[in-house]
Amino acid sequence: MDDLFSLAPPLPSSVECDRWIEHLFSARAAINGHVVRRKARDVERIVGWPRFRFELRRRGFTAIRNGAQVVIFCNALPLHKV
């Protein structure tokens, strides 16, 4: 029986992580202070939650995970549950 983990793709390099973060926060919506969303699986797989949280704090942004999606509020405004 094959090793289950041998089928998994290799972990991305630090350069790929940096490029993914740069791509995310250079989206027009992010630049204009709006909302962007990404798959939670991609955040975890590509950059990891600690790095993702660090990048959010560094920019003063907030993110919410709902199911398989992460919604990123690209501004420092408070959130109000409706």
Give the location of each predicted region:
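A sequence-composition feature that detects small, non-aromatic residues
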Residues: 8, 27-30, 40, 63, ...
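An N-terminal amphipathic alpha-helical segment
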Residues: 1-35
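Short, compact, well-ordered microdomains
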Residues: 50-82
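Short, contiguous, helix-prone interaction/anchoring segments in small proteins
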Residues: 27-61
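A signal for specific C-terminal beta-sheet/loop modules enriched in small/flexible residues
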Residues: 13-25, 49, 74-82
